[in-house]
Amino acid sequence: MRKIGIIGGTFDPPHYGHLLIANEVYHALNLEEVWFLPNQIPPHKQGRNITSVESRLQMLELATEEEEHFSICLEELSRKGPSYTYDTMLQLTKKHPDVQFHFIIGGDMVEYLPKWYNIEALLDLVTFVGVARPGYTLHTPYPITTVEIPEFAVSSSLLRERYKEKKTCKYLLPEKVQVYIERNGLYES
């Protein structure tokens, strides 16, 4: 069985925290690779103004292009409507029956697991990997593998706010992503 990590997210924008988590879990669990899974419409963020799929995908490509063990999975972008992890993983396990998927989530999502759509059936499809995030615990009634990572308190919402306030974001996200954001005037208002 191949071991593949999946890190889902809006990636609005992708930052060094995403890359750090993916890389740490890749090494800790001896994964073959990590797939970044950008969502179309995350159920817990419906109604929020999200940057276009095209821009988020371009930024994610720029952020991951130099790591050969990172790739981008477009499964959720090919569907309309909310992106439920269960639906996505059901499709991926059918397409890749030789893969054991490790679904990587932060502490915020570990606490949210009881509210996930079809969580009991999802547990049959993936192994959840929880990584600590400042302000959250990894306590859950569900079985998860935990991976300790260096604390790096950056979030996409923090970066959007910093751009809106015209503050520097240097060293918080890859330079190529920063250039893309500035050239395209993202997050200015």
Swiss-Prot record:
GO terms for molecular function: ATP binding; nicotinate-nucleotide adenylyltransferase activity. It is an enzyme of class 2 (transferase). Pathway: Cofactor biosynthesis; NAD(+) biosynthesis; deamido-NAD(+) from nicotinate D-ribonucleotide: step 1/1. Belongs to the NadD family. NCBIfam families: cyt_tran_rel (TIGR00125), nicotinate (nicotinamide) nucleotide adenylyltransferase (TIGR00482), PRK00071.1-3 (NF000840), PRK00071.1-4 (NF000841). Pfam families: CTP_transf_like. Its EC number is 2.7.7.18. Catalyzes the reversible adenylation of nicotinate mononucleotide (NaMN) to nicotinic acid adenine dinucleotide (NaAD). This is Probable nicotinate-nucleotide adenylyltransferase. The lineage of its organism: Bacteria, Bacillati, Bacillota, Bacilli, Bacillales. It catalyses: nicotinate beta-D-ribonucleotide + ATP + H(+) = deamido-NAD(+) + diphosphate. Keywords: ATP-binding, NAD, Nucleotide-binding, Nucleotidyltransferase, Pyridine nucleotide biosynthesis, Transferase. CDD domains: NMNAT (cd02165). The keyword Cytoplasm does not apply. GO terms for biological process: NAD biosynthetic process.
